[in-house]
From Swiss-Prot:
PANTHER family: DNA REPLICATION AND REPAIR PROTEIN RECF. GO terms for molecular function: ATP binding; single-stranded DNA binding. It is found in: Cytoplasm. It holds the Pfam family SMC_N. This is DNA replication and repair protein RecF.
Length: 361
């Protein structure tokens, strides 16, 4: 899979941009605040219908304009797919695939597979469980339509249950109904996550050993509020009932995959608590390259890899690993200088220079 071309109109600082990408390595070079990350962001948006930088779509629209437009021409499964995105100032968006308008975001997710590595991804190791849940949910949603459906339905039921918990007069019968529904959707979510963690461990083992020259072993462990993972549905219903009084007091649901997490261990030591920043960054690098392999295993094609200003933060060995591992993967790289890349680029690579919302090839 690879991107053939990208068009932007009134997107961030791009008034009108149309570029063709090569199926191999594409490097966007420029000083800070020139628009390099805006290109990455627009590509990412076509995969998930959301930015990785903001939840406010109107920020994507150029100043004093009414709308922004993205067109991504993608070659996937031996077919060309054109994704069109119109973003309006009122927060609405209109998306079409091959000129057919979609009615739900779920119809887009999985059409264009993408993995991104940016400096913010260090949060996957360092910060709250919500960051790690979001990572695993995004990865699984683009691979598994059923998972995305279960996640959407689970969150709807969770919202309704929490509304009941906030009422002065608690409707116990409604809570009974919501408990069963949560457990049904929650079981599917947890089972799929557990399988993903297995795959993550399978691929990460060799990747991390290679990056660290065999000095470290990495392992991921899923941490669930549901203790009996052999009987998730019944166990979850029971725990929701047992914790109902606490949930009523706190006005929030305490059991379920929305409270789960996964831990990252380096040589059996918790990377979040005891890992150095270098070790944490290497862990994220491992996760991202394992994600590439998982997507290849499931779909038969590598996704597009987006590397947003991360090479400058990697040491020589890690940088070399990245640049020697992307030969068969379309990669979009942003950076301020090309000096460290020249020996890894060839006649099949493409270099773009970004200057204040204008791109020269």
């Amino acid at each position: 899979m690879y991107i053939k071309s990208l068009q932007l109109i009134n997107y961030r600082n791009y008034e009108n941009l149309s570029i063709k990408l090569c199926p191999n390595v594409n490097v966007f070079i420029g000083d800070n605040a020139q628009g390099k990350t805006n290109v990455i962001e627009a590509i990412y948006y076509c995969g998930f219908a959301k930015s990785h930088r903001t939840n406010r779509d109107k920020e994507l629209i150029e100043w004093n304009k009414d709308r922004a437009f993205i067109r991504l021409d993608v070659h996937k499964d031996r077919l060309d797919k054109i994704i069109d995105v119109n973003i309006l100032k009122d927060g609405k968006k209109a998306i079409s695939i091959n000129s057919i308008k979609i009615s739900k975001i779920g119809e887009l997710i999985g059409t264009f597979n993408v993995v991104m590595f940016s400096p913010e991804d260090l949060k996957i190791v360092k910060e709250s469980p919500g960051i790690r849940r979001r990572f695993i949910d995004m990865e699984l949603s683009q691979l598994n339509k059923r998972y995305y459906h279960n996640l959407v339905q689970y969150n709807k039921v969770l919202h309704e249950r929490n509304l009941v918990l906030k009422n002065k007069n608690i409707n116990e019968e409604m809570l009974d109904i919501y408990d069963i529904q949560l457990a049904q959707y929650g079981e599917n979510i947890i089972k799929t996550r557990l399988k993903y963690i297995e795959q993550l461990n399978k691929y990460s083992k060799e990747i991390h050993k290679e990056i660290t020259s065999g000095k470290e072993e990495i392992e991921f462990k899923y941490i669930s509020t549901v203790k009996d993972l052999d009987n998730i549905k019944d166990s979850m219903i029971k725990l929701l009932e047992q914790n109902r009084k606490k949930d009523i007091d706190k006005r929030a649901t305490s059991i379920g995959p929305h409270r789960d997490d996964f831990n990252i261990y380096l040589n059996n030591i918790d990377a979040k608590i005891y890992g150095s920043q270098g070790q944490q960054r290497t862990s994220v690098l491992t996760i991202k390259f394992a994600s590439l392999k998982i997507i290849k295993e499931i779909t038969g094609e590598y996704p597009v890899l987006l590397l947003d200003d991360v090479l400058s933060e990697l040491d020589f060995n890690r940088k070399r690993y990245v640049l020697t591992s992307i030969k068969n993967i379309q990669t979009v790289i942003t950076c301020t200088g090309i000096e460290d890349l020249t020996s890894y680029l060839d006649e099949n690579s493409k270099v773009f220079r970004v200057i204040n919302g204008r791109i020269q090839c």
